[in-house]
């Protein structure tokens, strides 16, 4: 949990946002109001794909791929459920990071349905999303990363709109109601924060 989250954040901020090129004549304005969500999705997908790379174990960045699996579980759970505790019932997602997380989690869930990559389970009146195939999920993250990078590089406004509007905006009202009720009973904060320390060299 903790290690995976930190490594994901490092990959997202340092390498995710720091990678990828746009074609000549293409800029942020090409994607208009969808740019921020696409860029956050690209950085998250970079982190999600590479956190499962065995090279990170070889380099000693993570002790084992179990760290990556834990991060996959956390990401899917947050993207499909946990973050909904911050949204009023009946509202759509508006914030770029939240749209990005739902976009990614919903897209890989849908595209992996035929192979049961992520299973939606209902038990005792509660919904759970269980990852059944981590390698297949990593490949789906890679597929979506390639598409999101293409959208950004080419300034494909329609491609960005289709991804975000189809996967990142609307919330399943039944699941949303369930999430709100479950978290109200837990009495825990829907937000967590971290502080980046300043290093003087």
Task: List each language-model region with its residue ranges.
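Long, compositionally biased charged/polar accessory segments in the mid-to-C-terminal portions
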Residues: 173, 182-197
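Conserved small/polar residues in nucleotide/adenosyl-binding loops
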Residues: 199-201
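Extracellular/surface-associated beta-sandwich interaction domains
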Residues: 149-164, 183, 197
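An active-site-proximal "capping" alpha-helix that borders the catalytic cofactor pocket
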Residues: 36-53
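Short pre-active-site segment immediately N-terminal to the catalytic Zn-binding motif
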Residues: 1-8
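Post-HEXXH active-site segment of zinc metalloproteases
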Residues: 20-41
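Long, well-structured alpha-helical subdomains associated
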Residues: 48-148
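Active-site recognition of the HExxH zinc-binding catalytic motif
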Residues: 8-21
């Amino acid at each position: 949990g903790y290690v995976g989250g930190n490594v994901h954040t490092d990959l997202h901020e340092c390498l995710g946002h720091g990678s990828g090129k746009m074609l000549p004549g293409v800029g942020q304005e090409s994607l208009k109001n969808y740019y921020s969500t696409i860029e956050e999705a690209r950085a998250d997908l970079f982190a999600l794909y590479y956190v499962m790379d065995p090279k990170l174990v070889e380099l000693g960045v993570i002790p084992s791929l179990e760290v990556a699996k834990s991060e996959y579980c956390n990401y899917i759970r947050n993207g499909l459920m946990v973050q909904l505790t911050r949204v009023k019932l009946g509202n759509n997602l508006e914030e770029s990071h939240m749209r990005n997380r739902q976009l990614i989690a919903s897209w890989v869930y849908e595209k992996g349905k035929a192979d049961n990559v992520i299973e939606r389970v209902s038990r005792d009146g509660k919904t759970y999303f269980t990852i059944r195939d981590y390698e297949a999920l990593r490949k789906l993250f890679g597929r979506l990363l390639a598409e999101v990078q293409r959208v950004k590089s080419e300034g494909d406004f329609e491609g960005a709109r289709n991804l975000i509007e189809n996967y990142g905006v609307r919330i399943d009202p039944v699941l949303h109601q369930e999430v709100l009720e479950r978290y109200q009973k837990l009495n825990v904060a829907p937000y967590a924060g971290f502080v980046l320390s300043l290093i003087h060299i």
